[in-house]
Amino acid sequence: MKFFVDTADVAAIAELNDLGMVDGVTTNPSLILKSGRDITEVTKEICELVDGPVSAEVVATQADAMIAEGRKLAEIAENITVKLPLTWDGLKACKTLTDEGKMVNVTLCFSANQALLAAKAGASFISPFIGRLDDLNVDGMELIEDIRTIYDNYGYETEILAASIRTVNHMKEAALIGADVATAPPGVIKQMANHVLTDKGLAAFLSDWEKTGQKIL
């Protein structure tokens, strides 16, 4: 499973990228606001840092305007993925932009029916939102499983990009189900290294080593 980082924080992306943990990046208007930076400037910097797809989101709501914004965003770098909302206008824009050879990430997906439409419109990625479904006491992972089954049944090449990831368990479940990609905040990715028994075992080893009175360096 590929890891995308869900942030516009360049320093956080760089830290994970140095460890080989970054296969791509996703941003949205909220993350751009949080960064406090100009969208073109920060997106270009991210694209120069990361080789993989970098999602940049349109803010228009009508198809023609979405297409125009998507074309503008795609000029930033070759690895830009235009991010579009899963609306009827978004699907129209998706079809046009993918026909032009641009990568498209269709976002705010909350049903398998929506995911099927996005695949038929030629989306490069579909982004089902796990955490927001969980907020409504709906199993977000069941949606990932349904989309995986549908895409496999018919050979769709659209990649499933599990989004709205909030916990390390979300990451594990997405990998088990077969999501192609999971995008998560830097903190969640780093938390995947943590386990109480690892900490306990390390403490015991270090305590015993100290008792030997030896040094390695």
UniProtKB/Swiss-Prot annotation:
Active site: K83 (schiff-base intermediate with substrate)
Compartment(s) where it occurs, according to its Swiss-Prot or TrEMBL record: Cytoplasm
Gene3D superfamilies given in the database record: Aldolase class I
SUPFAM superfamilies: Aldolase (SSF51569)
CDD domains, per database record: Transaldolase_FSA
This enzyme's EC code(s): 2.2.1.2
The reaction(s) this protein catalyses: D-sedoheptulose 7-phosphate + D-glyceraldehyde 3-phosphate = D-erythrose 4-phosphate + beta-D-fructose 6-phosphate
GO MF assignments: aldehyde-lyase activity; transaldolase activity
GO annotation, cellular component aspect: cytoplasm
Family under the similarity heading: Belongs to the transaldolase family. Type 3B subfamily.
NCBIfam families the UniProt entry points to: fsa_talC_mipB
Protein name as annotated: Probable transaldolase
